[in-house]
From Swiss-Prot:
Its cofactor is Mg(2+); Mn(2+). The gene is cGLR1. Pfam families: Mab-21, Mab-21_C. One of its GO terms (molecular function) is nucleotidyltransferase activity. One of its GO terms (biological process) is innate immune response. This is Cyclic GMP-AMP synthase-like receptor 1.
């Protein structure tokens, strides 16, 4: 047993060195990044609010790894959700026929209340039944963001800013002082009800993490709906634009920031940041940061005690998370943390999963040596 303890202590030391040399980013870099993009985002949001009354109630919700304090490397990527507060949903899902097929798991549709759909008829953002088209709403926002940037460029400002649209977000690319910052702006609607697709999460049998009161608070908080198209599903083509994806960014942020309350020396976020850094340094694509975050949340449920996440247990938790990752890659299954029937690995190439599993296994066999080679 003492031999195993010595191995863990040695790996702990190496993991902490790796964190200091590879994972952490400097505070001055963070301040410089925020000063660069914040005025631009504020300017775009203000312009959009003024120019189109459908977006008059936009509010900014900070999401993603930077705001969960799990960002690795330089602070050059940021995720913001722009919540359309005027479309906040309180009611249970509507019962009337919306004329659309059943949405794939993880997605839903939004019906604008009768009498409130008139402004959304512009740009064909709603159909004749009052169903809100996510794709068209996002396109309108991108057009307005483009206009805002061109307006500022005509006044001699923001010459270093470009905007593009892809996936869930409208992305700003900002170049300054030899660095490029990327800011994803995702349109969202607050849904104060908890989705039926995620009902299992509320009643899931747990060993103590997250605590019942936190589960209750998150359930009562609801979720967001964002403009994201489904992958791996084949809804009727003309219906794809009407699909809104459930987002649990607010719940995830709450889990990371409140799930550790009272755990002064927790290594939860450090383990995640190390895994993210390994993904980047070893080019373990197409694994995404979200996959690793999902696996960490499951590992937190499996190891619920604060003692199991103490700084002294860093090496054990690191190895356990790697084992969980290898197992999921072997089985080609990574269940969404909130919607367990949704497989996040569904679109990954099976052969690529096997290849990644083999690479993770090699790390497990010689974790210290792999980390030392990457320390600069």
């Amino acid at each position: 047993m003492s031999g195993k303890m010595n191995e863990w202590e040695s790996l702990n030391t190496t993991l902490n060195r790796f964190t200091d040399n590879v994972v952490k980013f400097r505070r001055d870099s963070r301040t410089k990044a925020l000063k660069c993009w914040r005025p631009i985002v504020d300017g775009i949001v203000d312009y959009v609010k003024r120019k189109d009354d459908r977006f008059h109630a936009l509010s900014v919700f900070h999401k993603g790894s930077y705001y969960e304090r799990s960002k690795v490397g330089e602070p050059d990527e940021f995720d913001l959700m722009l919540v359309m507060d005027n479309l906040e949903l309180y009611d249970e899902p509507f019962e009337e026929d919306d004329g659309l097929s059943e949405p794939p798991i993880g997605f839903t549709t939004v019906m604008i209340d009768q009498g409130e759909e008139k402004p959304w008829k512009r740009d064909e953002c709603v159909n004749r039944r009052g169903m809100l088209n996510a794709t068209r709403v996002k396109a309108v926002f991108k057009r307005l963001a483009d206009e805002a940037i061109q307006d500022m460029k005509s006044k001699g400002h923001w010459r270093n800013v470009t905007v593009k649209s892809g996936g869930t977000a409208v992305t700003l690319k900002i170049s300054k002082d030899g660095r490029e910052y990327s800011v994803d702006l995702t349109l969202g609607i607050k849904d104060n009800t908890w989705p039926e697709d995620a009902e299992e999460w509320k009643t899931r049998q747990r060993k103590g993490w997250p605590k019942r009161n936190l589960v209750h608070d998150i359930h009562e908080m609801g979720c967001h709906l964002v403009t994201k198209q489904p992958k791996g599903h084949s809804p009727i083509e003309q219906e794809r634009g009407f699909l809104w994806c459930y987002s649990f960014s607010e719940a995830e942020k709450k889990l990371f920031l409140q799930g550790e309350q009272g755990e002064v020396n927790s290594c939860r976020r450090q383990v995640l940041r190390i895994l993210k850094a390994l993904r980047e340094e070893l080019e373990l694509q197409p694994l995404k940061s979200y996959h690793l975050k999902t696996l960490l949340l499951y590992e937190c449920e499996s190891q619920p005690s604060a003692r199991q996440w103490s700084k002294d247990a860093l090496s054990e938790r690191f190895l356990d998370l790697l084992k969980r990752l290898e197992k999921c890659l072997r089985s080609k299954e990574c269940p969404h943390y909130f919607i367990k029937d949704l497989n996040l690995f569904e679109m990954l190439n099976p052969e690529k999963c096997d290849e990644l599993a083999d690479r993770v296994n090699k790390i497990l066999k010689q974790p210290g040596q792999v980390l030392i080679r990457l320390i600069k």
